[in-house]
């Protein structure tokens, strides 16, 4: 991997003398800049606009070249607000793409799209930087082995397993436990895999970004006392940012993740919240760049933009980037071009259910709606596959019987159906699990359950060996031995 050392001050001053242009036109976040003949910047070069506005305030706006228009004119997209810019202002061509800090110094810190810290905790070590525009790893570098990425979360590992180096779509409304699930995954990858995480907040609410940061500090994912011990780097380009920043913040987060994979040879979790906002920002910029809109008003380059981001998220022989992407579906229309283009890249989907959350079953992952391409006998093995299928069949039958139970009651069911319902209710409760990051809220210690233990537990429930245990014994426990111990305690309390 190529690492760009930070440009020294003397180099910048010579650049200023060499490649100076002037603003010719400003259309919102898009600028047209005129350069001297033969001094045209390359596509994706970073341009810097320095000057003062009408009230004397210092202006420092970074732009990215998107088009070469001819007649020594380029069109660039601003990464911050263009307020106060005027025609004729000087523009410096830096001669390189946007570069951001990478490595251990980024952990525990919050950055903007330009890689500048925005958490008021002082400067970041910028000796190691990397450009945000890079090619996807060459085919020969890819790790072609299909392997499961064990999360320690029972419902995920059993029914919708994640692929190491894969892409997972996370679907769920507000208040169903998306943030807590994300934090638990960050915690578990650090403890079980010695990996780190990068969180890219793309075009979402600033309040949510702040809440996530506060909760991460509270749960220990970000270590305030020793920042270097933190397990995650945060990159935010929120709703109030111009479209240029929202369009590129995903690449900034990805660049930081690539360094951990390629240089530190670690397993990395990359969270993107929300991938739809990445498309939306591209759509806003596309119209301003004069491109003809495509279906439903989206940019004609939608598939290319999505592909250039997604293809960089992969496993190599050094390490892996496993990406979990929150997907907003506009008007719940799955055929909308934005979510439809995203689905083409996903290996698994994790769907959070409000119904399960209302029952108090956390994580509220819907076992019937969540899917994974990894759940095949040749990948996970016959035992895992058979157990998962039987669990799904039992839950599906319970779902079909719920209307009858609501109208006529349990007594009207056949003996076989009553047994199915009893086991399904135990399975439903056993799919819940106490989280490490929720210890501060619940008071019960978190549990990491290995895949073999998970399969053994569900096999025992399905076989009927535990039919005599009360269903509350299976609620919020780790492995099956804890459920049997809890049942004995409940029995003792009754006496």
Swiss-Prot record:
It catalyses: ATP + H2O + 4 H(+)(in) = ADP + phosphate + 5 H(+)(out). It is a peripheral membrane protein. PROSITE patterns: ATPASE_ALPHA_BETA. One of its GO terms (biological process) is proton motive force-driven mitochondrial ATP synthesis. GO terms for molecular function: ATP binding; ATP hydrolysis activity; proton-transporting ATP synthase activity, rotational mechanism. Transmembrane segments: none annotated. SUPFAM superfamilies: C-terminal domain of alpha and beta subunits of F1 ATP synthase (SSF47917), N-terminal domain of alpha and beta subunits of F1 ATP synthase (SSF50615), P-loop containing nucleoside triphosphate hydrolases (SSF52540). It comes from the Eukaryota. ATP binds at residues 172-179. Keywords: ATP synthesis, ATP-binding, CF(1), Chloroplast, Hydrogen ion transport, Ion transport, Membrane, Nucleotide-binding, Plastid, Thylakoid, Translocase, Transport. It is an enzyme of class 7 (translocase). One of its GO terms (cellular component) is mitochondrion. Disulfide bonds: none annotated. Its EC number is 7.1.2.2. It is found in: Plastid, Chloroplast thylakoid membrane. F-type ATPases have 2 components, CF(1) - the catalytic core - and CF(0) - the membrane proton channel. CF(1) has five subunits: alpha(3), beta(3), gamma(1), delta(1), epsilon(1). CF(0) has four main subunits: a(1), b(1), b'(1) and c(9-12). Produces ATP from ADP in the presence of a proton gradient across the membrane. The catalytic sites are hosted primarily by the beta subunits. This is ATP synthase subunit beta, chloroplastic. It comes from Hyacinthoides non-scripta (English bluebell).
């Amino acid at each position: 991997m190529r690492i760009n050392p930070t440009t020294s001050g003397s180099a910048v001053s010579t650049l200023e003398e060499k490649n100076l242009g002037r603003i010719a036109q400003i259309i919102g976040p898009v600028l047209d800049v005129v350069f001297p003949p033969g001094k045209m910047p390359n596509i994706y070069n970073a341009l810097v606009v320095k000057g003062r506005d009408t009230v004397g305030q210092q202006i420092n706006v970074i732009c990215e070249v998107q088009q070469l228009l001819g007649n020594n004119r380029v069109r660039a997209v601003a990464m911050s607000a263009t307020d106060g810019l005027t025609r004729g202002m000087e523009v410096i061509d830096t001669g390189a793409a946007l570069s951001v800090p990478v490595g251990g110094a980024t952990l525990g810190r919050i950055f903007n799209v330009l890689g500048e810290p925005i958490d008021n905790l002082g400067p970041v070590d910028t000796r190691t930087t990397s450009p945000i525009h890079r090619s996807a790893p060459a085919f020969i570098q890819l790790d072609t082995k299909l392997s499961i990425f064990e999360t320690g979360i029972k419902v995920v590992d059993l029914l919708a397993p994640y692929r190491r180096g894969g892409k997972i779509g996370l679907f769920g409304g507000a208040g169903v436990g998306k943030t807590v699930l994300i934090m638990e995954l960050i915690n578990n990858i650090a403890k079980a895999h010695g990996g780190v995480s990068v969180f890219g907040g793309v075009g979402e609410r600033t309040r949510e970004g702040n809440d996530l940061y506060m909760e991460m500090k509270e749960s220990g994912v970000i270590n305030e006392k020793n920042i270097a011990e933190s397990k995650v780097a945060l990159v935010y380009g929120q709703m109030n940012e111009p479209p240029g920043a929202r369009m590129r913040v995903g690449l900034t987060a990805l660049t930081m993740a690539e360094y951990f994979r390629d240089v530190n040879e670690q397993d990395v979790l990359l969270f993107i919240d929300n991938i739809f906002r990445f498309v939306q920002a591209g759509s806003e910029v596309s119209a301003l760049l004069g491109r003809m809109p495509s279906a439903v008003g989206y940019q004609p380059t939608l598939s290319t933009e999505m592909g250039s981001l997604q293809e960089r998220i992969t496993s190599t022989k050094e390490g892996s980037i496993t990406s979990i992407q929150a997907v907003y579906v506009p008007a719940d229309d799955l055929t909308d071009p934005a979510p439809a283009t995203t689905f083409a890249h996903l290996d698994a989907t994790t769907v959070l259910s409000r119904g399960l959350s209302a029952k108090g079953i956390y994580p509220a992952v819907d076992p019937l709606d969540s899917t994974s391409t990894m759940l095949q006998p040749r990948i996970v093995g016959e035992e895992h596959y058979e157990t998962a299928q039987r669990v799904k069949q039992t839950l599906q039958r319970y779902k079909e019987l719920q209307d009858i139970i609501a109208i006529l009651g349990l007594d009207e069911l056949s003996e076989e159906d009553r047994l199915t319902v009893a086991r399904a209710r135990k399975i439903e409760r056993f799919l819940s699990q106490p989280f490490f990051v929720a210890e501060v809220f619940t008071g019960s210690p978190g549990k990491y359950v290995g895949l073999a233990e998970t399969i053994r537990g569900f096999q025992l429930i399905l076989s009927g060996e535990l039919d005599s245990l009360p269903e509350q014994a299976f609620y919020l426990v780790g492995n099956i031995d804890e459920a049997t111990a809890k049942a004995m305690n409940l029995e003792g309390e009754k006496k």
